Every structure is written in C-alpha cells, then in structure tokens.
Amino acid sequence: MRNVIAAVLLAALPATTGAQQVGILPVKLLDTSREARDQQQDHQRRMDILAETLLSEIDDASLIGADVVATCSPETTECLLGLARDSGDDQALFIVAQKTSTLILQLFANLVDTESGNLILSRNLNFRGDNDDAWRRAGRFLARQMREAGE
C-alpha cells in the first residue's frame, strides 16, 4: 500500500526534464603562431562562428555577449559565473583557442556550474586549418562531445 501511495504522490509532482541552460561566453584566442599578417578580423569572425555553431548544436544554450562580459573588470571567474547565473544560465561554457601554427589549433573548453563553480566537463581538442569551415567543424565536434558526456 505504501508503494501505491508513493507512486501516486510522485506522479503528482511536476515533471522536470533536467535540461540545463548553458551560457556560452565569448571565445578567447591565444595566437602564438607568429604569422606576419594581421588576422585579428578573421580570427574574430571565426571565434564568432565557433560560438554560433555551439549555440545551434547545444540544446538550451545562449550566448553571453562581449558587451555583457565587459562589465566584469577584471574578468574573474566569479564575476563571469555571476553574469551567466544572472542571465538564467545553470552552466557556463568557457573556451580558449590557441593557434600554434598556420595549420594547428587547440580548443580548451570547460563547462562550469554557475551556482557552485564546480567543473562539470573539460575537453581539449586539436584541429587543423585556420579557416571558417575548420572552426565550424570544431564547434560541431565539441558540441557532440558535450552531448555524449551528458548522456
């Protein structure tokens, strides 16, 4: 009888999907390739492509704009997590790309709980090609890695 009562009470509770809102912070770039040509505009476009790809590939994601992040001075982890939390995000995605040569790049991605500050997921990915398509593919791959880790 207790099991029946417990089942009825549990059925009356609102269903939760467990979906977590993910705030994607602006991607940062460390360029150590020493290329002579100034590629700041190309790199900014590619970082935006990466963020937009993640936004389209991750359920319940939102972009936290650079203008919002600029209110954190200095940009401490606590301040950035607070911005994400204030935006309604349960998790914040921090990404740093490192360009080591004209062809080789790495992504360091960390998903952090905005309430506790605990690291949920960390991925270090290598990819080749400093062009729009390579950054887009890297974004899709990272999103897939995040989905698989959450299953």
Predicted regions and their residues:
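Positively charged n-region of N-terminal signal peptides that target proteins for export
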Residues: 1-4
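Cleavable N-terminal signal peptides
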Residues: 6-7, 17
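Hydrophobic alpha-helical transmembrane segments of integral membrane proteins
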Residues: 10-11
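C-terminal/domain-edge helix-coil "capping" segments
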Residues: 19-32, 49-53, 60, 83-86, ...
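Glycine- and acidic-residue-enriched helix-capping/strand-helix junction motifs
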Residues: 35-49
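Short, glycine/charged-enriched secondary-structure capping and boundary segments
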Residues: 37-39, 107-110
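Short, solvent-exposed, polar/charged sequence segments at loop or secondary-structure edges
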Residues: 57-94
